[in-house]
Amino acid sequence: MTKFEFFFDVSSPWTYLAFSQVEDVAVRCGVEIIWKPILVGGVFNSVNETVYEQRANPHPVKGRYYVKDLRDWAQFCDVKIGNPPVFPVRAVTIMRACFVALDAGCLPAFAKAAFEAYWGDLKDISQPEEIAAIAQSVGLDVGHLAAAIQSDDVKARLRDNTEELIARGGFGSPTMFINEQDMYFGNDRLVLVEAALMAAQNQKTQA
C-alpha cells in the first residue's frame, strides 16, 4: 500500500484545516494515514525562526489578507476558527497526549476535539483540566493519560517525530509525505497530495 504520513501540531490553524479534509482524501485514495504528532515550536526553533519575527511584525497588507484567507478556508472546510486569547499556546502536553490517543486507537477523534477546543471554543489547551475534558470526550481514561504523558517513552516519541520531520526537510505543520520522499507542506497542497496518492495507487495497481 502507498505510504502516507501526516505530521501535525494542533496549535496551527492551517493544520486544523488540513486535518478536517485529510481523512476524506485518504478514503478516496484508498490509503491509511500514518499520524505523526510533532511539536511545531521545536521545528521553528531549529529551522524556521523567521516565523516569530513575522508574527511579531506582520506586514500590514499581507496581514489583512492572511485574516481573509484563513476565514475563507475555514468557511470552505466548514470549521470554526476564532482568535484564541492564548496564542501561541504551549502545546507540548496536548501533543504528548496525542500519542496516548494514538495507542488507544482514537487519535483522529482526540485531535479533532483538541482542534475544536482551541480554535472553535477558544480554550487554553495547555491547561490540565482542558486536556482532561478533551480526553473524557473521546473515552480516554484521564488517570492513565496523566501518567502516560509524563512517561519517558511518550516524551521521546514526540521528540523523535519532531526531529524526524526536521531531518527529512520539514519546516512546519502540516507536512505530509507520500512513500517516504515526496513531501507536501500546507493545507492548500492537499489537492496535490490527493492527485499524487491517486497516481501512486494506480501505479501499484498496474504493476
Predicted ranges, named:
Residues 2-5, 9-32, 36, 106, ...:
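C-terminal cap of thioredoxin/glutaredoxin-like
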Residues 16-118:
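Structural alpha/beta surface segment adjacent to cysteine/selenocysteine redox centers
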